[in-house]
Amino acid sequence: MTLSEMAVDVLTTADGREKTRRSHAHAATWRAARAAGTLIPLGQATPPLHPARPDTPELLSPRDVPKRKPGSPTGRLALLHAVAHIELNAVDLHWDLIARFTHVSFPPGFYDDWVKAADEESKHFNLMCDCLESLGSHYGALPAHAGMWRAAEDTVD
């Protein structure tokens, strides 16, 4: 599998836990190859216009996401949910960037850094999900917005 195919594999996986599992596995494959002195072919695969998403959370316009007081228990839960959502978007944004720029002659270190960052964001998403679940909630329990992904859409050309 080429690096761009790995990126598209992550981007076309809807479930957050599975998406981050694949992200971690692809990052480990990339790192192992680099440690062995080889470079996985970059390839060229077209990323989807939108990453696959689970059925929840409901995605609202940023102005329509309910405001909550951060000092209240529900406000703290909403903050944790928002951070989990940010982390999942970051996973997609990192892999999207990798898929979009495999046609450019960047040094391998460029891809090393973005693969590492995608892997770290995957870890952060899972930590936030674990935290939400320990509090009796889960990712997707509250609405969120797609504002971060709009930046990728706005720069697709």
Where are these regions (language model features)?
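Non-heme di-metal
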Residues: 1-157
